From Swiss-Prot:
GO terms for cellular component: chloroplast. It comes from Chlamydomonas reinhardtii. Its EC number is 1.3.7.7. Component of the dark-operative protochlorophyllide reductase (DPOR) that uses Mg-ATP and reduced ferredoxin to reduce ring D of protochlorophyllide (Pchlide) to form chlorophyllide a (Chlide). This reaction is light-independent. The NB-protein (ChlN-ChlB) is the catalytic component of the complex. The keyword Manganese does not apply. One of its GO terms (molecular function) is metal ion binding. [4Fe-4S] cluster binds at residues 102, 127, 187. Keywords: 4Fe-4S, ATP-binding, Chlorophyll biosynthesis, Chloroplast, Iron, Iron-sulfur, Metal-binding, Nucleotide-binding, Oxidoreductase, Photosynthesis, Plastid. The gene is chlN. Its cofactor is [4Fe-4S] cluster. Pathway: Porphyrin-containing compound metabolism; chlorophyll biosynthesis (light-independent). This is Light-independent protochlorophyllide reductase subunit N.
Amino acid sequence: MKPLKLKRLIMENNKSHATNLSLGGPFQGNCMPINQYFSKNQPNRGSSSSEKRSSLLPLWESKNAADGFSIVSHNVLLDGATTILNLNSFFECETGNYHTFCPISCVAWLYQKIEDSFFLVIGTKTCGYFLQNALGVMIFAEPRYAMAELEESDISAQLNDYKELKRLCLQIKQDRNPSVIVWIGTCTTEIIKMDLEGMAPRLETEIGIPIVVARANGLDYAFTQGEDTVLSAMALASLKKDVPFLVGNTGLTNNQLLLEKSTSSVNGTDGKELLKKSLVLFGSVPSTVTTQLTLELKKEGINVSGWLPSANYKDLPTFNKDTLVCGINPFLSRTATTLMRRSKCTLICAPFPIGPDGTRVWIEKICGAFGINPSLNPITGNTNLYDREQKIFNGLEDYLKLLRGKSVFFMGDNLLEISLARFLTRCGMIVYEIGIPYLDKRFQAAELALLEQTCKEMNVPMPRIVEKPDNYYQIRRIRELKPDLTITGMAHANPLEARGITTKWSVEFTFAQIHGFTNTREILELVTQPLRRNLMSNQSVNAIS
């Protein structure tokens, strides 16, 4: 039997296409009427009494006070709690079969974000085949990730896992010499009970390279939660203050940098306490997006002390009770929990900076946490953030004309559904349903509040939110509602297109730059692409006829 071996993922530079899967034949059965579908009085069949009680709590503050949770108390939290109470009639949990990628796919973007890292996925051939298809690279690229392939001798415990992993890590150190090695656990390591967390501290001492263990396996609800697992593990690694790689060249950690702010904006003891606060943003986005969001906050007098993850592992920020943290993506609830429980950080509850409306409120909530009022425009009397939001929407009129009055249906794939639905509602679309693999109503309280507010402002019904949707029943609802656009995973795209349903791959929103003010056009370009294709096709048919 062969021992555990290091298998580099090298493949041809080709593109993968969605498989034309069968959906069990043609559509059958009748769907519920639309008036019943949007009924506010429909019972919540998927929520238990304990889930209903917990949804009324203002995030983690009341429920887990003993765990050291703390949260910035703004009006949005009260509004968010009230909104969640009202959302019970719109929320449903089907616990059905749905399709998504494996969370180990987070390696695709994290190894590029953390430039001095090396990701080692510990799994079977199935994991390797998936990564080879999902992470296609050219043969001379030498990617900073590899596959530690488990074979029969490893699973039957005939080999010493520690010795084999040590041999591989020494080989990685010799070949690449990274600043950190990230072990990605898989379903197999869970089943055979590999003690990765127990081996990592001992091994990193021997080889002199920190090792972060992240169990990003198929037990999660969505593939984007793999990033959540890795960032949560890195947040725990930042607690090792005695480790040299956490200290920069100046000998100071990022959290020791004071927030630069004029004394005129704060007064008294509270002002001195605010001056000690530092801001750390967590979420993996491209470096151009981090620069844009950092500059947006700097315009309002707020300096970002650090990002999780950082481009270099040695710049990983440390966290303490004086650290304010705010999320970038809606699938990072585990990271937020770790930062609050283990690091005693304070979480700023805010919508996510997706779309100009979400970005504006996101910046406003951060400003409120630091006691800063957003700058005003002396001509209009509005805040500069509000004027900029309106200016961006005015510049998108060519896209908005195509979207107004159109309907969209989210089948659920990457946990970005609520933020995208809120933005598309603001653009004039009608959202029939928001399918989402997993919804943390506490972490997304502000996003849910903004969604409800946007629906009221646009005078459209609140969409039904279906957690863990059953794809079979979703397809029946799609047939009944006939949406103009269905945002779905790759597994269903081709079969739905074959049945005359316009689709868009949800995974494209994961890899596109959709955060901040400047990337709004990128979102609308993705959304309108299939609609414009249909429009051109219809025009061609009419011209021929």
